[in-house]
Design a protein with these regions (language model features):
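Extracytoplasmic gate region of multi-pass secondary transporters
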Residues: 35-36, 236-295, 349, 353, ...
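Extracellular/periplasmic helix-loop-helix junction of adjacent transmembrane segments
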Residues: 36-67
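Helix-breaking motifs and short loop linkers at transmembrane-helix boundaries and internal kinks
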Residues: 47, 80, 101-107, 118, ...
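Central cavity-lining transmembrane alpha-helices of secondary-active solute carriers
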Residues: 58-74, 284-297
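Conserved MFS/SLC helix-loop-helix module at the cytosolic interface between two early adjacent transmembrane helices
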Residues: 67-106
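Cytoplasmic helix-loop-helix junction between adjacent transmembrane helices
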Residues: 111-148
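Glycine-rich segments within core transmembrane alpha-helices of 12-TM secondary carriers
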Residues: 141-165, 186-187, 373-383
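C-terminal transmembrane helical hairpin of 12-TM major facilitator-type secondary transporters
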Residues: 307-355
Length: 438
């Protein structure tokens, strides 16, 4: 059967964009969280308290991240993803590598703050970039595929990072220094690759035929007309639009729950009586399950077209998994419960992130998406402290898991009361989805 123009076009775009951008995000997330593995020996070498370590890992990083999130995305919209994503990756690679040379508490705070500034705008920039290339019916799947980089980076990051740290003493450098130097290198190389490989807009794509460009331009223009027929927004109107604020609260709740879990997952799993080696592998199980759940959820949300109710159901699933983990912590049942929670965390994202583009376009979309991500990620400065405080007070992670479940319930409630219906008549799924998944 001769492929339709939609099938031909979208197959080319999926294979051109998804593997490369997924690799970028894998490296991005690994460079963000590898400090947790480095801390196994770095904390003692630098004389950092646990409080100082947490302040640098979370608070300093996310303050920097918050400050430049919106400006970064607006700049990307103006000058294009090719140059701006390359800039982001090269600067974060340099700063991540510079972490190898911190010498104490304040230099650690400074480099983490600078890393947050450098990385700001990468994720919302990618979400915005996808709106330039993918019609609405395809966005759930592309976001699902892209965001599988998070659970994969967590699942693989522990053994890779701890293996690098075995270089301790080589050329007179501590293992944690080698960790930062080696894992920063791919960001630098991929940043340069962005200049060669990324294409800002479909009209500049030499790898698309003229009829394919025309079809895609018509599809995206149709979406823009539908959105603008409802209303157009300035940057400031977008940032303070009630729907944008509601989406930010939803993302804050689910980010609070997921960040709180990932920070303490190893300690929760350690309660099963495992060695450090097997704790790492057991900790990866929920994220393998979450990866599968995200991919399936991406197909389901594009087929159904109802982003809001899919998001609501998966937020509740995350809450249920966390509550069950609180009930069963210290037993192997908690691994199953946490796997349910990760399906909810990651499965909701393919339904959630296409929603801003249902009512925002252009610069307003750039600002709105970045604002949602910036406000949501402020959760990273709060939840680890909440879980740790409850653990100190009660001696158990159960109460902390219940608190995280409460944040996920908040997201579910706001999804229902704060987000209007997102149902749009979506074209029938074509074979391109299956082709992209093969």
């Amino acid at each position: 059967m001769v492929a339709t123009i939609e099938q031909r076009t979208m197959r080319k775009i999926y294979w051109r964009i998804l593997p490369f951008t997924g690799l970028l995000y894998f490296i991005c997330y690994l460079d963000r969280v590898n400090v947790g593995f480095a801390a196994l020996t770095m904390r003692q070498d630098l004389g950092l308290s646990q409080a100082a370590l947490g302040l640098g890992m979370g608070t300093a990083f996310f303050i920097g991240y918050f400050l430049l999130e919106v400006p970064s995305n607006v700049i990307l919209h103006k000058i294009g993803a090719r140059l701006w994503i390359a800039r982001i990756m090269i600067t974060w690679g340099l700063i991540s590598g510079a972490t190898a040379f911190v010498s104490g508490e304040w230099s650690f705070y400074t480099v983490r703050f600078l890393l947050g500034l450098a990385e700001a705008g990468f994720f919302p920039g990618m979400i915005l970039f996808f709106t330039y290339w993918f019609p609405p019916v395809h966005r759930g799947r592309i976001i699902a595929g892209f965001m599988t980089a998070i659970p994969i980076s967590i699942a693989l990051g522990a053994p890779v990072s701890t293996s690098i740290m075995e270089l301790n003493g080589f050329l007179g450098l501590a293992g944690w220094k080698w960790l930062f130097l080696i894992e920063a290198t791919p960001a630098l190389l991929l940043g340069i690759s962005c200049l060669l490989f990324l294409t800002d807009r479909p009209e500049k794509a030499s790898w698309l035929a003229a009829d394919e460009k025309a079809w895609l331009a018509a599809e995206l223009k149709k979406e823009q007309r539908e959105v603008e027929a409802e209303r157009t927004y300035s940057v400031w109107q977008a940032m303070y639009n009630p729907r944008v604020i509601a989406l930010a609260v939803i993302y804050f709740g689910i980010a609070a729950a997921s960040v709180g879990l990932v920070m303490f997952l190893a300690q929760i799993v350690k309660e099963l009586g495992l060695s450090n080696f097997w704790t790492g592998y057991a900790s990866s199980i929920p994220y393998v399950v979450g990866t599968i759940g995200m991919i399936v959820a991406g197909f389901v949300t594009d087929r159904m077209g109802q982003r809001r109710w899919n998001c609501f159901a998966l937020c509740l699933l995350a809450a249920a998994g966390l509550a069950l983990a609180g009930l069963t912590h210290g037993t192997w049942w908690s691994i199953a419960a946490l796997s349910i929670a990760t399906i909810g965390f990651y499965g909701m994202k393919p339904s959630f992130w296409p929603m801003p583009s249902l009512f925002l376009t252009g610069t307003a979309a750039a600002a709105g998406i970045a604002w949602i991500n910036a406000l949501g990620n402020l959760a990273g400065t709060i939840t680890p402290w909440v879980v740790g405080t409850i653990k100190d007070a009660t001696g158990s992670f159960g109460g902390g898991l219940y608190a995280l479940a409460g944040f996920a319930v908040l997201s579910a409630i706001v999804t229902v009361i704060g987000v209007p219906s997102t149902r749009r008549r979506a074209p029938r799924l074509t074979a391109v989805a299956e082709a992209a998944a093969e």
